[in-house]
């Protein structure tokens, strides 16, 4: 049985299929049959031993004090960083008691009982939105994000100075303001904020948001995709602007479980079909739960036919708002639908 969740208040079921779909803020779909999707761990490219630097950097960007002897300890003593940290503490407390509390209540009420046995969460057109992906799918161990924005790089600690911290922290506030104030990233803002104005890509913001939301960064590795959809370590010396994908491993609070989010900088329109390596990688992971949130209605367009087809044919559940897959595809496809809003 397919299932879809939508936040608009409608729903449907077809016992011929064992799929789940959900439309977020418009509808939710859940799996209702006994057959389980095959699961497997995401393939891992061989990598060097993890370092503490990614977690140090994540905490620094998030306004959270790091190790006393860490590489950012002197910068954390500057007045601009301390003001940024204090302001962020207050803002975050408000979010936790406001919009995040509502999301958590929705997740517990509408999604917690949905068992899809999916291998991972697929979040196309995601930007760096690890916040809501983790909130809606708190038990997921693997996430695959994708979009046009560049991967980005982690600047070395030596590139920051006390003299530049006022400017740096103002930029960080700018970068995070959209997800905090609106609950989503605006495409037009990301186009310049994550192409040099704030960061040179999404990785720093992904780390910032993971750290602020109670996660520890275990490791960060850059990868490239082979034509047959396998991950390989990126060639040494690859310029930051040429990064194809990044893998971030993280833990939540005291939970020892290591979770993974991949971000792929790729064309998901015509490129999804013309360059099938990414689709092959997704297929190698098994079947996903799919999240589409603030997707600019791109999945309504003909140019995204291949991506939409992948979502409909492979997802066990789709959680989306009305910017995702057009509603008619679910009514015609025999999905179980729950709508909200």
Write out the residue ranges for each language-model feature.
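Sequence context surrounding c-type heme c attachment/ligation sites in exported
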Residues: 207
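Mature extracytoplasmic/lumenal regions of exported proteins
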Residues: 178-200, 211-215, 219-293
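C-terminal motif of bacterial Sec signal peptides marking the signal peptidase cleavage site
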Residues: 31-32
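Short, thiol/selenol-centered motifs that function as redox-active sites or metal-ligating centers
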Residues: 126-137, 144-145, 182-204
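Cleaved targeting-peptide boundary
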Residues: 35-42
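Bacterial N-terminal signal peptides that target proteins for export
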Residues: 4-21
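Sec-dependent N-terminal signal peptides
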Residues: 20-28
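Non-globular targeting/processing and membrane-anchoring segments
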Residues: 42-174, 263-341
